[in-house]
């Protein structure tokens, strides 16, 4: 069990198991946006795509280049610490991690439902709905946890005082920014303190999942939670 937790929390494992979700998301968005003047996409995805468009890669190619770059970075990082995790990918851990993430997602769903006092489910779950949920899991976790929270945790480790306290502050900051991002732009939600606090609570849980269980668990927890909110 110790080997399972150590292996599945690695960045390389997280990047690799996020790729199938990203592929499904890209295909579903291509189908959903056929013939539309304004594309519907996850905001975090749009942000990443614009960055890569600036260096000459656009559309799905930008996603391919981004994940190739992530894979190289993760492989180098894991190779430098191979005495801890090893380079080999143990695929039999994949379904176990999905089941583990589903449990975290159910906990998140329960907490969010209690906070919101009620949930409004959508009874019809389409392949495109699933794709959008998977994309949110991948791109929002890459932005707010893999990049933002990792950066904040790095800074927290350099600050004077108790590192644990600073790490909790880092998770809180990333959670607040994650919640606030849902109200930005034309497609953003209407702000209310209840929804903001609820999303902040969700960001806290996802932050701790990322910190203790790695990118893969955070991505799948987020994606499965989004599917729960549509289906349950």
Where do the model's predicted regions map?
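Hydrophobic core of alpha-helical transmembrane segments in multi-pass integral membrane proteins
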Residues: 19-26, 64-79, 105-111, 176-177
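Interfacial helix-start motif at the membrane-water boundary
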Residues: 48-70
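Juxtamembrane "helix-exit" motif on the non-cytosolic side of transmembrane helices
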Residues: 30, 113-122, 181-187
């Amino acid at each position: 069990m110790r080997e399972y937790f150590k292996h599945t929390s690695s960045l390389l494992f997280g990047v690799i198991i996020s790729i199938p979700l990203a592929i499904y998301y890209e295909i579903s968005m291509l189908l959903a946006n056929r013939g539309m003047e304004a594309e519907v996409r996850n905001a975090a995805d749009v942000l990443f795509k614009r960055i890569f468009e600036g260096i000459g890669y656009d559309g799905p190619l930008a996603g391919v280049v981004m994940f190739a770059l992530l894979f190289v970075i993760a492989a180098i990082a894991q190779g430098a610490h191979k005495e801890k995790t090893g380079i080999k990918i143990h695929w039999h851990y994949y379904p176990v991690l999905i089941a583990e993430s589903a449990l975290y997602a159910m906990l998140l769903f329960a907490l969010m439902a209690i906070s919101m006092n009620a949930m409004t489910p959508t009874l019809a779950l389409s392949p495109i709905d699933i794709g959008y949920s998977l994309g949110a899991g991948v791109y929002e976790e890459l932005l707010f946890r893999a990049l933002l929270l990792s950066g904040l945790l790095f800074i927290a480790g350099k600050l004077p005082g108790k590192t644990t306290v600073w790490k909790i502050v880092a998770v809180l900051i990333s959670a607040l920014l994650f919640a606030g991002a849902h109200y930005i732009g034309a497609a953003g939600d209407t702000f209310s303190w209840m929804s903001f606090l609820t999303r902040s609570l969700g960001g806290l849980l996802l932050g701790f999942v990322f910190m203790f269980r790695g990118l893969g668990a955070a991505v799948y927890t987020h994606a499965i939670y989004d599917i729960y909110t549509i289906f349950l």
